[in-house]
UniProtKB/Swiss-Prot annotation:
Quaternary organization: Monomer.
Top-rank taxon: Bacteria
Pfam families in the cross-refs: iPGM_N (PF06415), Metalloenzyme (PF01676)
Cofactor: how and how many bound: Binds 2 manganese ions per subunit.
Leading EC class: isomerase
Residues the entry annotates as binding Mn(2+) 1: D402, H406, H461
Reactions it catalyzes: (2R)-2-phosphoglycerate = (2R)-3-phosphoglycerate
Protein name as it appears in the record: 2,3-bisphosphoglycerate-independent phosphoglycerate mutase
CDD domains in UniProt: iPGM
Amino acid sequence: MSKSPVAIIILDGFGKRAETVGNAVAQANKPNFDRYWANFPHGELKAAGLDVGLPEGQMGNSEVGHTNIGAGRIVYQSLTRIDKAIEEGEFQENKALNNAFTHTKENNSDLHLFGLLSDGGVHSHINHLVALLETAKDKGVKNVYIHAFLDGRDVAPQSSLEYLETLQKAISDLNYGAIATVSGRFYAMDRDKRWERVEKAYKAIVNAEGEKFEDPIELVKASYANDKNDEFVVPAIITKDGKPVATVKDNDAVIFFNFRPDRAIQLSNAFTDKEWDHFDRGANHPKNIKFVTMTLYNPSIDAEVAFEPIEMKNVIGEVLSNEGLSQLRIAETEKYPHVTFFMNGGRNEEFPGENRILINSPKVETYDLQPEMSAYEVTDALVEDIKNDKHDAIILNFANPDMVGHSGMLEPTIKAIEAVDENLGRVVDLILEKGGSAIIFADHGNSETMSTPEGKPHTAHTTVPVPVIVTKKGVTLREGGRLADVAPTMLDLLGVKKPAEMTGESLIQK
């Protein structure tokens, strides 16, 4: 039977900004997007700050965006939740955190804090690290060591010195704690199974393998002199009196304070997996460690979780499933967790009637080297699916504007957007031919701002609104929409009643 599918099409990191300088979205030749914008109802959505459950003025990101999109309601994000717990004293009494503290006291061992050192608020926040230091000291933990992962991606490419100085000031004010290793997130926070990167971070933390420096500031300066910005700092060791400050040993405790799961999973696995074949962990692989993660990274990780997920009922996948509608989730590797796990409110398993297609992202060092990424392959698979009338609802993510946008390079990002536009045309025209409709929008901004006012590369997300197009004639879109309104709009287009839990509203004016 012929289907008229309704699709959610996410152009990841494709924000809306009037200024054209440094704006890859404005400068790209995108005839398909422009044609839909000219011919169909369109507007903009808020995708940052309070509108997605983040602190005011905080830029959106893919995890938060997809969670809000799938939930059809504003979802209180981990960042806000942990901030609130610190403020209200719950953090200090958190069971999992206290179990880590107790473990070190019972074993006369050390506590190690892993995580991304910045205030980017995408994967972590430096305030949470400082709160952990204060709490561990209050609770009588003898020694605490920090394994700092440098950012340079959700914040400026060379901003780690200020975060290291903030951390060193906290250490000095508390007279407690020390930095043991420093690593760029490229190594410690890989998510694409490039195990040789993770291995470098792991071996620095466990074996003190890597270049040695007495001062983390000197380490970073040496890296800059070597043309390696924060993200790419090779894992290195901090020494005192010629000896490594600390390594993770048997009976120690680890708290991984990143709250966003996807880039914390692989390193966590390296420490906790019983069965392991990705690289040789060596004779020093620590035994009997207490491993605590700030949030649930993956149910398969043998760790205690400080902030368990809040279960969400009636997310878009569940509603479609309960209505007996078939649904497809499709993306390449980099955004596959977003259209599945995050879209399903932190649930890994498929709902009945939900199918998934994963297309591998290209194995290149950085995506500016291949700006089209796997957009053509994703589209080939989807076109085949639509032609065969497989699904009533489709959730598609094009990763390119975001992943190439993170390079801070304008030209490759323009190419990325042009590749996406070509493929967007193939998908949407086919959906329209089938009598279906699409909601085309972004989860957050990025590629519309590729340079700072000073003309330096801008690699982070932004707080700008995102464009939205609903490819249905004869309807009007209301103003003031946000990401939480997308799922109700999809249900509206499918003729399905919105459940009470979805507090977002359809964008289509009644």
